[in-house]
Amino acid sequence: GLLYLSGAVRRLGRVDHKDAFLDTYELERKRGITIFSKQAVFTHRDTRFTLLDTPGHVDFSAETERTLQVLDYAVLVISGSDGVQGHTRTLWKLLERHGIPTFLFINKMDLAGTDQNSLMMSLKKELDDACVSFSDQEEERAEQIALCDESLFERWIEGALPKESDIADLIVQRRLFPCFFGSALKLEGVETFLDGLSAYVRTPEYPSQFGARVYK
């Protein structure tokens, strides 16, 4: 969905149709899962992203962990129908260990029985209390964001909403974890998520001397 909406690919693939763009190996298409990390590039609102798609299955967690060392930000995708699972907590601890700023996308919200409020309560309890829904209106999430920082909270009490730069700083410091809800299959909430990425990610400052890190 990210690559399709950003115009990087012209055709929207589906895992269950065995034609997902980044599932290039026959075994991946056959089993409907990602086994090997893949790379793609896309642009949204003048921000250029390099996407590293990693396995979500517990059997291939070593492949995922190797990729973490080169990430500036992470996007943790959670099934809205399943909620936080044991492997979700394992990935969360790995992201914490590596100090990687993290966005969350809660997928499959089109399925019956999914409830955003219940999921948010679970995310706050199971992962971090600084998980905040960014699928709500700005005014509704402002208080939750302000609670992540004392000075922001004081400004919020006086009527000032958190600035975009304030939010970006909290994210990179891992003091705020934006949560977006939607359905990748139906492209619901994906555009909002892309807008959030473009608004709140910051390009790290790299040394002038060339350097590289091999992750696979």
Give the ranges of each region predicted by the language model.
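Structural and coupling elements of P-loop NTPases
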Residues: G1-K216
